[in-house]
């Protein structure tokens, strides 16, 4: 239908009518009512390949990977929108403007800004476990205050994407001169993000090379 589109470059589909989206494995799982391992086997058979036998550990890792991507996608989308539209974030926009970075650059690199006292953890914890959110590297537990803190609060954020254009980590920069805070920070390494294996803007470089 006209509302259904497939992005060959990023290897995902999206239906604007139902908001359903995902990769080829998601599509087969939804349309055939398969589990992940069954979808892989089915596609391998269609391609004339010997399928890999997925274990329960493989399926659990795939589930964790999807949760990880969803957390980062929601996080980046929310704070990108806030930077573009929230009137109280004019200081962040002015900071970028003084460095010749306007709305076009903000959209191109999907920059965002996080206020000093954010509360996005409360929104995400309705969908994900506290352990999963901490494992993403975006949050940590302040044991003295017994509360979860957003690692990039008070910073401009720059998504670090995988080669498919999906955010898997962040770079952050403070916009105020505070000697007790590091000017730049990056996401810590996680089970799904290894600093030596990902380059900033690698997905954009791939587009330019095609």
Model-derived features: where do they sit?
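Helical mechanochemical/support elements of P-loop NTPase systems and associated helical scaffolds
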Residues: 24, 35, 39, 92, ...
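A general alpha-helix detector
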Residues: 23-27, 74-78, 91-95, 119-120
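Terminal peptide-recognition signature
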Residues: 15, 28, 96, 158, ...
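N-terminal single-stranded DNA-binding subdomain of primase/primase-helicase replication proteins
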Residues: 1-33, 41, 54, 67
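Phosphate-handling DNA/RNA-contact segment within nucleic-acid enzymes
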Residues: 60-67, 74, 115-210
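Short, conserved phosphate-binding/catalytic loop or strand-edge motifs used
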Residues: 11, 45-49, 93-98, 103-119
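Conserved active-site segments centered on acidic
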Residues: 38-91
